[in-house]
Amino acid sequence: MPASSNFQEAIREAQYGALVGPNVVNKALPYVGGGMVLTAGGVMGGLALMASNPAGFMPLFWVALIGNIVLFFVAQNVALKGNNSTALPLLTAYSLLTGFTLSGLVAMAIGTAGIGAIGTAALATGITFVAASVIGRRMSDSVGQALSGAVGLGILGLVIAMLVQIVGGLFVPGFGSGGFELLIAGFGTVLFVGAAFVDFYTMPRTYSDDQYLAGALGMYLTYINLFIFILRLIIALNGGGRRE
């Protein structure tokens, strides 16, 4: 799951309900869309490499994963300072690397449920975005803060569950697959649907208009995570998480 620490920070800063950046959402949305396009390009690059040079994919995957984590924190810090001319190329590289690191999951989804799984996940993510953009902007402070708190606690619970899944799988073969994977994938999907609505509430209460790239990064992470968990859910429902 890509980093989401800035989302939790946004929840804390949005508790008072006052608008900090009334135009930040509209300024951020084109960059969220651009990030998604770049991510798709990174996925296609990863799939092409897996097809042409499977042995070379994993070493590059680990390099990309480490670089992706470092880039996230650097880009977030620069974007929060409003230094958008420097943040933009960093976020461009981050989006491409994110796509590359997701290519293995996409390949697994295609192998398990067919190419239609990618279209289903993308369509569901897009529908969530449209609904969240309409409802999230009109959310009252009481509802917005309550949902923000619930999503924040949910993210904490999800991280703990995923750590248990990873550690348990190291000691007990098959521990993290099957029903456990289905539960995590389903919970993650519901959680990030909620986070999508929260984003439209918290962003103008957290970021100034000059911090639109920081806001775009947070929203981008929400939709990337939603896409990931929908794919994981599709894979689990099609038996891809089972081990004989």
Name each model feature, range by range.
Residues M1-E244:
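A hydrophobic alpha-helical transmembrane-helix feature that marks the membrane cores
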